C-alpha cells in the first residue's frame, strides 16, 4: 500500500496526475505480455492495473473480453499470472501494481489464500469488480491482513452513504467511474465529476483515479483539472494490442507513443 502513498506524494510535489494503463495478463501470450508491461512502464506509466483472465468479465466491454479470450487461447492460468506478477515486481520494485479481479477467481483457493499470494508476489491493491461495498467485508478484511489495498468503485450516481463507505473502506486509490455501463474506449467518459471528487476529498477517501472511457490525452488533462489524482485507461490500450497482433514490434512502438502522450497530458 505504501507504494501508492509514495507515488501520490511524489506526483503531488511535481504537480502531476498519475497515468495508469490497464492490460490483461497473458494477452496475447505470456512472453509478449511481459514485453508490453515493460513498455508501458518505460513509456511513463505511474502504476499498473492488471487483469487476470476470466471467462465471464461482466464489467467489461468487447475489447477487454477479447483480451481475456486471447489469454485463454494462449493457455494462461491464474497460477502463471502470479508467476508473471513476481517477475514484474522483481524488475520494477517501486511501481504500484493493482489487480482487477472477479470474485470467483478470489474464491477459488479461498479468500485469505488469494490475498496471501498477492502479498507474496508484491501486488499492492485488488479491485474485485463484482463485489459491491456492502458485501465486501471478507475481501477487504483479508486484503488488509496481507497489506493489500482494497479498491472500491465510486459510480457517477453515488449517494452520500456510498461515498462515505468508499472513503472509509478503500485504501490505495479510489476508482472513480466516468459513467455507468461497461468499459470501452468508444463510450467516452463524461465529465465533469468535480462534486464527487470534492466529496471524496472531504471524507478523506484514497486519491481518485478516473476510469472508463479514457482514451485521449485531453480526457487525462480534464480529469486532473477536475481534481482527480489521475486517470486509468484500459480499452484504448488493449485496442492497440488487438490491432497489432501480427506485428509485435509495431504493437510495442504504438503502445509506447500512446502511453507517453497520455502521461504528458497528466502534467497539464
Curated annotation (Swiss-Prot):
InterPro entries: Aldolase_TIM, RibuloseP-bd_barrel, Trp_synthase_alpha_AS, Trp_synthase_suA
GO molecular function, one term: tryptophan synthase activity
EC number: 4.2.1.20
Residues forming the catalytic site: 49, 60
GO BP term (any one): L-tryptophan biosynthetic process
Lineage: superkingdom: Bacteria
Record's keyword annotation contains DNA-binding: no
Pfam families: Trp_syntA
GO cellular component terms, semicolon-separated: cytosol
Reactions this protein catalyses: (1S,2R)-1-C-(indol-3-yl)glycerol 3-phosphate + L-serine = D-glyceraldehyde 3-phosphate + L-tryptophan + H2O
Pathway named in the protein's UniProt entry: Amino-acid biosynthesis; L-tryptophan biosynthesis; L-tryptophan from chorismate: step 5/5
EC category: lyase
Keywords attached to this entry: Allosteric enzyme, Amino-acid biosynthesis, Aromatic amino acid biosynthesis, Lyase, Tryptophan biosynthesis
Function of the protein: The alpha subunit is responsible for the aldol cleavage of indoleglycerol phosphate to indole and glyceraldehyde 3-phosphate.
Subunit field text: Tetramer of two alpha and two beta chains.
HAMAP family (alphabetical): Trp_synth_alpha (MF_00131)
Record family assignment: Belongs to the TrpA family.
Name recorded for this polypeptide: Tryptophan synthase alpha chain
Naturally occurring in which organism (per UniProt): Salmonella typhimurium (strain LT2 / SGSC1412 / ATCC 700720)
Amino acid at each position: 500500500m505504501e507504494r501508492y502513498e509514495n507515488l501520490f506524494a511524489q506526483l503531488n510535489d511535481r504537480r502531476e496526475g498519475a497515468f495508469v494503463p490497464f492490460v490483461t495478463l497473458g494477452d496475447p501470450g505470456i512472453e509478449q505480455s511481459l514485453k508490453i508491461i515493460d513498455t508501458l512502464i518505460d513509456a511513463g506509466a505511474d502504476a499498473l492495473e492488471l487483469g487476470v483472465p476470466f471467462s465471464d468479465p461482466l464489467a467489461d466491454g468487447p475489447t477487454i473480453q477479447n483480451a481475456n479470450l486471447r489469454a485463454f487461447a494462449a493457455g494462461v492460468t491464474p497460477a502463471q499470472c502470479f508467476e508473471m506478477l513476481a517477475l514484474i515486481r522483481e524488475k520494477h520494485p517501486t511501481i504500484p501494481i493493482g489487480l482487477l479481479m472477479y470474485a470467483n477467481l478470489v474464491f477459488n483457493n479461498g479468500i485469505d489464500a488469494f490475498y496471501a499470494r498477492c502479498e507474496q508476489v508484491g501486488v499492492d491493491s485488488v479491485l474485485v469488480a463484482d463485489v459491491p461495498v456492502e458485501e465486501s467485508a471478507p475481501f477487504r478484511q483479508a486484503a488488509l491482513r496481507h497489506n493489500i489495498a482494497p479498491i472500491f468503485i465510486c459510480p457517477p450516481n453515488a449517494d452520500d452513504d456510498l461515498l462515505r463507505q468508499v472513503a472509509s473502506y478503500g485504501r490505495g486509490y479510489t476508482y472513480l467511474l466516468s459513467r455507468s455501463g461497461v468499459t470501452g474506449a468508444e463510450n467516452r467518459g463524461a465529465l465533469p465529476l468535480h462534486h464527487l471528487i470534492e466529496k471524496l476529498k472531504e471524507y478523506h477517501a484514497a486519491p481518485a483515479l478516473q476510469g472508463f472511457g479514457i482514451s485521449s490525452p485531453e480526457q487525462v488533462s480534464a480529469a486532473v483539472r477536475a481534481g482527480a489524482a489521475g486517470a486509468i485507461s484500459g480499452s484504448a490500450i488493449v485496442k492497440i494490442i488487438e490491432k497489432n497482433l501480427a506485428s509485435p514490434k509495431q504493437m510495442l512502438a504504438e503502445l509506447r507513443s500512446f502511453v507517453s502522450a497520455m502521461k504528458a497530458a497528466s502534467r497539464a
